Amino acid sequence: MSGTSMDGVDAAYLKTNGIDIIETGMAITLPYGESFRNELSEIVSKGVYSKNVESQITNIHADAVKHLIKKNGDARGSVDLIGFSGHTIFHIPNEKKTFQIGDGAMLADLTGIDVVSDFRSNDMINGGQGAPIAPVYHQVLANNLKKPVVILNIGGVANITYIGDDDQLISFDTGPGNALIDDFIFFRLGYRQDTGGKLALSGKPDKKILESLMDHIYFSLNIPKS
């Protein structure tokens, strides 16, 4: 997958029976080069499609799959399928509009493995907000934990998953995550991220700014929301 931080492609090797995770293998991040990151950032900021960028990002995902298989020590034939979310170019959930670049057929050709893709659109058609994978994965991780359970995932955008006693599943975005932090660090210091949270740990929260941010209308909206 490729997230809002636009730092690279994350790939993980999982064995599942569709209900439980039977085995976890290696996980890798294949970083984007500076030139491609700039190209991707440009089309995201404009909300436009680029066949060239789509082709490049699909090739990078294929490379990530090949690296992961090699690192995990498995033959390509042992992988049944690839889940491919692509990269979101624009997302307007209230209008049920979402678009991701990434060519699933091309990825299948490049890897020789079946590909499942474009699951965000189907989630929105069925009343979701276009982010179906994280909550289901969290639910599987929590199979053997005492319920209720809450899991907070801080990616570029932060999201929360609630799993109730009866396995009720509720998930929604809580607000900005690492994306704004990364932008701030880059524009002020020229670094891509606050590695290890060192700068954050050296300071303290500004309560006035935090209170003004918490007044944002998003926090008063009912779920589902993203």
Predicted regions located by residue number:
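Short glycine-aspartate micro-motif
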Residues: 1, 78-83, 149-153, 171
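Conserved ATP-utilizing enzyme core subdomain
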Residues: 4, 8-30, 170-226
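Glycine-rich nucleotide/cofactor/substrate-binding loop typically near the N-terminus or early
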Residues: 13-72
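Electropositive phosphate-/nucleotide-binding environments in soluble metabolic enzymes
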Residues: 30, 34, 51, 55-62, ...
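Short beta-strand-loop/turn "lid" adjacent to the catalytic site in phosphate-handling enzymes
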Residues: 48-104
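A structural motif corresponding to the C-terminal end of an alpha-helix
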Residues: 74, 110-114
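Phosphate-binding/catalytic loop of phosphoryl-transfer enzymes
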Residues: 93-98, 113-193
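Polyanion-binding surfaces on beta-sheet-dominated domains and ring/shell assemblies
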Residues: 107
